[in-house]
């Protein structure tokens, strides 16, 4: 990987490589764009196969956060942090050392909870920096509002595809039954949807079966089901050249980040199959909306009102895609970049005045 060329092509402002010997820590903080506000992005801990894989994850996720904030009309930019480590070796000393790196940016980057980071970990990080959000006691955690946003996004996709506001009787396959996936199943069950679910943890799958009458399938079977909607709510990269040919769903709308392994190639493959794709960073923006509201003083009513905008934003994106003959992923990116560029122009005019 040519580092500076890659960073330039993806439009990043800053990438920090954080290293400490005592305690041993390797972390990458990627700041994509701060035009609309400070870079917001959660922190994850994963045992990446190599440093290039960690950097690729941080760069792509931070860019997605920029677009997510812009599409959600949140005055924030995009960032992301990855700690290269086995989560089983996580210690308070490591987390506090990482917190000091975050603090050194003086609010340019604000972080929170992601893969293998718990609310307790966030509290440990907060001992070293105030630039951390998402502590569960303040807002109740992001899962309820994120799942609501995904549910509203599914309704928007159904309206765009079939000009209908009804979900009853539809078949929906949900992949991944963590907090967001489980909450999404609850919303869908309440609207008389026929659920098919999978998870690598059979205990989670059996719980959703018991609670919502879902049909449990093997993780490898979830792609090829004859359903109306496929909702990926696990890890990213699952829409790729291997899985897309198996898909029978008419709509893809789920909570997972970076669902497309290759944004350009695989968004086009979906479009050619006639599948309506709901861009992940738009439909799953509820988590960002939640932590942003926590940062400014949490108001649950205001946060849930903002998440309802996901419905209208997706309808606008689907319309842009139709009118301009582009993929929905490109339409979402254009909407986000238009908002960012408009902000840049406004700032330039203000400086000139």
Swiss-Prot record:
What this chain does, per the entry, is described as: Catalyzes the reversible oxidative deamination of L-tryptophan to indole-3-pyruvate in the presence of NAD(+). Shows weak activity with L-phenylalanine, but cannot use other L-amino acids and D-Trp. Cannot use NADP(+) for oxidative deamination of L-Trp, and shows only weak activity with NADPH for reductive amination of indole-3-pyruvate. Involved in the biosynthesis of scytonemin, a cyanobacterial radiation-absorbing pigment.
The record gives the effect of mutating residue 132 to A as: 1.6-fold decrease in catalytic efficiency
Cite the effect that the entry attributes to residue 288 to M: 586-fold decrease in catalytic efficiency
- Kindly identify the residues recorded as the active site: 80 (proton donor/acceptor)
The stretch of residues making up the signal peptide is: none
Which keywords does the record carry? NAD, Nucleotide-binding, Oxidoreductase
Q: Which family does it belong to?
A: Belongs to the Glu/Leu/Phe/Val dehydrogenases family.
Name one molecular function that GO assigns to this entry: tryptophan dehydrogenase activity
The protein's name: L-tryptophan dehydrogenase
Show the NCBIfam families listed in the entry: Trp_DH_ScyB
pH note: Optimum pH is around 11.0 for oxidative deamination. Optimum pH is 7.5 for reductive amination. Retains more than 80% of its activity after incubation for 30 minutes at pH 5.0-11.5.
The regulatory note on its activity is: Highly susceptible to inhibition by indole-3-pyruvate. Activity is not affected by the presence of metal ions, EDTA, KCl or DMSO.
């Amino acid at each position: 990987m040519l580092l500076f060329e890659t960073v330039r092509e993806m439009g990043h402002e800053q990438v920090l490589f954080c290293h400490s010997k005592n305690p041993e820590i390797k972390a990458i903080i990627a700041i994509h764009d701060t035009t609309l506000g400070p870079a917001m992005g959660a922190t994850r801990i994963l045992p990446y196969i190599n440093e290039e894989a960690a950097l690729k994850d941080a760069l792509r996720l931070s860019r997605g956060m920029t677009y997510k904030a812009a599409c959600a009309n949140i005055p924030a930019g995009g960032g992301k942090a990855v700690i290269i480590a086995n989560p089983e070796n996580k210690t308070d000393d490591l987390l506090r050392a990482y917190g000091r790196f975050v603090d050194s940016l003086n609010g340019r980057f604000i972080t929170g909870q992601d893969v293998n980071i718990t609310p307790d970990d966030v509290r440990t990080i907060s001992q070293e920096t105030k630039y951390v959000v998402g502590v569960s006691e303040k807002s109740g955690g992001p899962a309820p509002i994120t799942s609501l946003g995904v549910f509203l996004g599914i309704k928007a996709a159904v309206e765009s595809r079939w000009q209908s506001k009804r979900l009853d009787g539809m078949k929906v396959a949900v992949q991944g039954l963590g907090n967001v996936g489980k909450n999404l199943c609850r919303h869908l069950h309440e609207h008389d949807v026929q659920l098919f679910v999978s998870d690598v943890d059979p205990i989670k799958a059996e719980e959703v079966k018991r609670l919502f009458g879902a049909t449990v399938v093997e993780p490898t079977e979830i792609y090829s089901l004859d359903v109306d909607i496929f909702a990926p709510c696990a890890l990213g990269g699952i829409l790729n050249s291997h899985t897309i040919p198996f898909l029978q769903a008419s709509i893809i709308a789920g909570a997972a980040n970076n669902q497309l392994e290759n944004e350009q190639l695989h968004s086009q493959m979906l479009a050619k199959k006639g599948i309506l794709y709901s861009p992940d960073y738009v439909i799953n923006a509820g988590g960002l909306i939640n932590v942003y509201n926590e940062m400014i003083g949490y108001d649950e009513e205001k946060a849930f009102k903002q998440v309802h905008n996901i419905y209208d934003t997706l309808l606008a994106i689907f319309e842009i895609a139709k009118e301009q003959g582009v993929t929905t992923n490109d339409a979402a990116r254009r909407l986000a970049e238009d908002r960012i560029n408009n902000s840049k122009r406004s700032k330039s005019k203000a400086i000139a005045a």
